[in-house]
Amino acid sequence: MSESTGVSTIVVGVDGSESSILALRWAGALAPLFQASIRAVTCWQFQIAVGTFTPVLWNPDEEARKICAEALSQAFGDSTPVDVQMVISQGPPAKVLIEESRRARLVVVGSRGHGGFEGLLLGAVGAAVAEHAKCPVLIAHGSDLPPAFPEVAAGPSTIGSNQAGSAHAGS
């Protein structure tokens, strides 16, 4: 998607964590309101450590694609919104999401991802994206959506259905 298309896009950082699944649900709830497509972005990068090697058979793109697909399945079940694009990108997640924000209406990230410290309210990626993004950022925190989105909070069975979209249109 380019900046000149005029299509509204919600970018979501996806790492497979519960927090990123909640971020996907937020994007699913907001997409009809913004008439937006969703870009589910999963990043990978080589971890450099002294005395180790990268397995030759490791396919990071495929692993990231599986993580993203599983997160979409957990977030939406069989009701994945029609206009969802999986984006697999090599690089630091914060840098990739900030770059994605240049062409987005909104970026949604979870409050904590994998590898974070348990007591933190906001992870390093979320903090960096919130500070440097070129569009508004929503940081999904907790475990539920607000009551304004009951069909989404109810779980995967009704997310993205035509009834869910029409319920939002009247409010």
Question: What do the predicted segments below correspond to?
Answer:
Residues 103-149, 157:
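Gly/Ser-rich helix-loop-strand patches that form or flank binding pockets
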Residues 56-67:
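A short acidic, glycine-rich active-site loop
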Residues 77-85:
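A short helix-to-beta-strand connector/capping loop
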Residues 23, 50-53, 96-99, 120, ...:
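Short, well-ordered secondary-structure micro-motifs
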Residues 2-54, 146, 156, 161-171:
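Small/aliphatic-rich secondary-structure junction motif
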